[in-house]
Each structure stands twice: as structure tokens, then as C-alpha cells.
């Protein structure tokens, strides 16, 4: 069941000031951005309408500091231990930095009290060796594990979609969906493929392992509204969902009773009482 709660974005970012946070945490420096040339730190950069559907694009999209700072904030504020990232880039650098900070601040407690076996790891998946090497060769990211996967057309409940194969065998508490692009899957489903300028990305990987995720897991999609709606229509467990239209972000939080003592400890430590307040609200939905 999906519980739509537009207040989730306010809960996730309570106390967050993007301009202050970007400066305090060196987000621009991490992303390789010159602040003197960037402009307003709090506003999104407008793109050419065809930029994201250009199959010949050979350069990464320009960094958006508002989005990157929010990702950094989420990792720290939710005491994230394990990240699964679909599509890598500047976000990978940001995740690495945030996980290093969490490792310094949290590892002693987490190692002794929680069942988290991929602690402070970001597992980043991409089907392009080029982009993996671009990040790997330019940055020393010791918390990042790179996964080169094939991208194939497939189906979920009869609906055409894409899958990465293989996937890393980890249990993330934060999933960031920013890949794949729509032009590179292999194969088709009865002639249907995402490889067309009028189509859009439609990844179904999360649906395959949804039943393994632990309560408290957060999914963030960067834009990809059609894909987010596909997830929303096919996720089977109890999720709190919010579309932040201004930021062009979608958030899904797995909002269920803890699975057991270790999951309860994780929720108490990472998310606190506000999680159980949301859970109580959802029961009246």
C-alpha cells in the first residue's frame, strides 16, 4: 500500500538550509564546481528540453548543488550505512564523503549493536564502463564499490521495463535511482524498447528485491517521474510516498513495523521517534 504524504519532504529536510549546508560541507568543492560561476545555490539549473533525451550525449550533466547537498544531508541525518546507487557520477563522490563521516561518528555503535554487514559502503551500478572509469580514475573513493552490469529489456507483471544484470547482493538502507539512461538497453519486448526519444527510463530492479528491504529504507529518484509512478503502481509493501515537484525528486520510505530486534535498534538509532510517529499516522490512512 502506498500512503501519499506530501509532508514527507518537510520531515526529511527539517532544519536543512541548502546554501548554508553547501558551504559548511564543501559540496561545491567535492563536485568540482566554482561557486563564483554557479549562481544561486538554492535554485535548479534549467536544461535544454532535449538534453536528457540525447542519445549522443558524451559528457555528464552539470552538477546541481541543491540535489547533491540534499543527498549528503539524507545520508548524515538518517545515519545511513549502505547505499545502492543506480547510475554513478557526482552523487557517488558525495555519497563517499557522507559515508566517511558516518563511519567516523557511528561505526562503534553500529558494529556492536546492529546487523549491518556492508557498513559504510556505496555500491554504484552502471552499464557504461566509460562512466565508471571516469569516476574511478579521477577520484579516490574508498567507500565506493563499482559494478559494471548489462542493461536489458525485460518485463514486470507484463509491463516492459529495464533490468541491470547482475546486481550487487547487498541490503541498502538508502537507494538512489539516477540510472539507467533510456537509450542503451539490449533487446526488446515484442518490439518495445526504451530506446526512443519519446520514451523514458523504466527501471524495475527495485521491485525484484523489494521483499528483502528492511523497514526504514528510503528510495530517492532524481526526476524520472514516469519511472517513479511505475514503482508506485507496483510496489507491494507499505510505503510513504512524496513527490517534491519543485525539486523534481520522489521519495519512498518503507513504513512498516520493525522486523525484529536488530531492525528495531536500527530504526531507533538512525531515524528515532519521528519514524514511529509517521507509522502511527499511516495506520489511520
PLM regions with names:
Residues 180-285:
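C-terminal substrate-binding/active-site "lid" region of AdoMet-derived donor-dependent transferases
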Residues 165-179, 185:
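Short SAM/SAH-binding signature in class I
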Residues 79-89:
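Conserved class I S-adenosyl-L-methionine
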Residues 128-170:
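S-adenosyl-L-methionine
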Residues 90-115:
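Conserved SAM-binding loop of SAM-dependent methyltransferases across substrates and taxa
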Residues 103-104, 118-120, 214-217:
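A short helix->loop->beta-strand "cap" motif at the edges of active sites that frequently abuts
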Amino acid at each position: 500500500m502506498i500512503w501519499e504524504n506530501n509532508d514527507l519532504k518537510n520531515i526529511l529536510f527539517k532544519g536543512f538550509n541548502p546554501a548554508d549546508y553547501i558551504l559548511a560541507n564543501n559540496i561545491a568543492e567535492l563536485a568540482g564546481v566554482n561557486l563564483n560561476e554557479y549562481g544561486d545555490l538554492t535554485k535548479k539549473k534549467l536544461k535544454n528540453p532535449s538534453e536528457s533525451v540525447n542519445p549522443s550525449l558524451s559528457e555528464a550533466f552539470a552538477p546541481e548543488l541543491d540535489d547533491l547537498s540534499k543527498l549528503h544531508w539524507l545520508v548524515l541525518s538518517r545515519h545511513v550505512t549502505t547505499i545502492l546507487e543506480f547510475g554513478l557520477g557526482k552523487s557517488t563522490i558525495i555519497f563517499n564523503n557522507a559515508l566517511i563521516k558516518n563511519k567516523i561518528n557511528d561505526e562503534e555503535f553500529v558494529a556492536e549493536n546492529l546487523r549491518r554487514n556492508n557498513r559504510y559502503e556505496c555500491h554504484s551500478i552502471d552499464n557504461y564502463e566509460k562512466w565508471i572509469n571516469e569516476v574511478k580514475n579521477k577520484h579516490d573513493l574508498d567507500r565506493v564499490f563499482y559494478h559494471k552490469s548489462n542493461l536489458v529489456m525485460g518485463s514486470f507483471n507484463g509491463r516492459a521495463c529495464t533490468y541491470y544484470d547482475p546486481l550487487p547482493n547487498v541490503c541498502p538502507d538508502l537507494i538512489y535511482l539516477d540510472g539507467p539512461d533510456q537509450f542503451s538497453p539490449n533487446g526488446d519486448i515484442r518490439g518495445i524498447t526504451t530506446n526512443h526519444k519519446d520514451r523514458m527510463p523504466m527501471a524495475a530492479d527495485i521491485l525484484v528485491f523489494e521483499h528483502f528491504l528492511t523497514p526504514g529504507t528510503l528510495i530517492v529518484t532524481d526526476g524520472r517521474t514516469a519511472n517513479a509512478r511505475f514503482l508506485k503502481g507496483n510496489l507491494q509493501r507499505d510505503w510513504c510516498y512524496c513527490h517534491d515537484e519543485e525539486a523534481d525528486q520522489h521519495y519512498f520510505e518503507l513504513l512498516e513495523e520493525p522486523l525484529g530486534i536488530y531492525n528495531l535498534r536500527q530504526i531507533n538509532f538512525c531515524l528515532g521517534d519521528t519514524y514511529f510517529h509517521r507509522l502511527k499516522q499511516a495506520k489511520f490512512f
